[in-house]
Structures are given as C-alpha cells and as structure tokens.
C-alpha cells in the first residue's frame, strides 16, 4: 500500500476513535484539522482535487450533488458556485455541520446548498445524480448497497480510496501543490459494475 494511503488510514482511524463517522470535505487548507474539543482529525480535500472531482463527474446545472462526510462544505459550495446546481452536504459531526452552514452563507449559495447532520449509512441516495466520497475503504464498502439504488447514469466520484470490487469507469491522478502529493480520483457510473475475477 502506498505510503500516502497508510498515512491517510492512520488519520482516518484517529477519527473513528473519537466519532462514529470520519468526515472529509474541502475550502482552502490541505492540512489535517484537529478539533480542539475531541481531537478528531478532519482531512480536507485539496481545492485542485475538488475541482477535478466535479469536472470528471461532468457536473451540470441540472445535477443534484451529495457530499457524504462534507466537513467544511467545500465540495458542495464549489459545485453550486461553479455549476449552479443544487447540492447537499451530510456530516454526523454537529460542529462541522455548523461550520459548513457558515461557509455556505459566506459564499452566498444558501439557495442551492443544504447541510444536514445525518448518519450517511441511513440516507436515501436515490435523488442524487452525483455523489462525492473521501472515506476509508471499509466505509465505501458499507455504502455500496445504498449507492446501487441510485438511478442509471448517476455518478460516484471517490478521492483516494476506490470502491472495492467495483469496476471504475475512469481513474486519474492529481498532483497537488506545493506538497507534490499524487492523489487518485475514481469515477463510477450507475449501474455499478462488479469486477469479474478471471
């Protein structure tokens, strides 16, 4: 496993110890953010990766984008700001939800973006046309049954961790600056296609 994945796993594991859900969104910094109250680590998605995730999903004004584990709300804010689409961010951490809501207002996209405090594993995802994920592989696996209920043509975009045993339609790597770290992005289109072992 690449060193960057090991490091990310360590940070994600720290979050599991302090909360039920790791969340990772993205608005400016790429550095891990440590909550003062519970030491939970939130790893923001770099802006360049956010932009590429939305681009590869071919987000358009008519789309409805869900970000599961929205952190500071940067992905849904970027989607609404650039493409004029509706977007919903979900997070189980009430403080991150409040932060996201403040960022939504600050960016003037309240009419397009909602932020909700919910358990992502209990969501009905059928109304989403695009879903963005930056979660641990185990969490991605747990979400697959929900993702499979999305409508044909809907897209799922994963940052760094792929959906296990699901064939991706596209994989690309974005090298972020100034750290020079390569970050993988995986695109899936519904219906999801299982990997067939040869």
Where are each of the predicted segments found?
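Bacterial N-terminal signal peptides
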Residues: 9-24
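Class I SAM-dependent transferase core
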Residues: 28-61
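Conserved class I S-adenosyl-L-methionine
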Residues: 62-71
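Conserved SAM-binding loop of SAM-dependent methyltransferases across substrates and taxa
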Residues: 74-85
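Conserved SAM-binding motif I beta-strand of class I
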Residues: 86-91
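S-adenosyl-L-methionine
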Residues: 93-127
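C-terminal substrate-binding/active-site "lid" region of AdoMet-derived donor-dependent transferases
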Residues: 138-198
């Amino acid at each position: 496993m690449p060193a960057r994945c090991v490091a990310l796993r360590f940070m994600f594991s720290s979050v599991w110890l302090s909360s039920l859900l790791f969340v990772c969104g993205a608005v400016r910094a790429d550095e891990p953010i440590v909550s003062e109250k519970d030491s939970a680590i939130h790893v923001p998605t770099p802006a360049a990766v956010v932009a590429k995730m939305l681009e590869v999903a071919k987000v358009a004004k008519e789309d409805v984008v869900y970000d599961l584990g929205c952190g500071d709300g940067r992905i849904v804010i970027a989607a609404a700001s650039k493409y004029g689409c509706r977007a919903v961010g979900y997070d189980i951490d009430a403080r991150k939800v409040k932060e996201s809501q403040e960022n939504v207002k600050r960016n003037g996209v309240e009419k397009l973006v909602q932020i909700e405090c919910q358990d992502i594993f209990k969501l009905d995802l059928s109304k989403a046309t695009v879903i963005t994920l930056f979660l641990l592989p185990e969490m991605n696996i747990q979400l697959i049954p929900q993702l499979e209920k999305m409508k044909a043509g809907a897209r799922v975009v994963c940052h760094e961790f792929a959906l296990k045993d699901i064939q991706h339609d596209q994989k690309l790597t974005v090298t972020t600056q100034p750290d020079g770290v390569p970050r993988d992005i995986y695109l899936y289109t519904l219906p999801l296609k299982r990997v067939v072992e040869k």
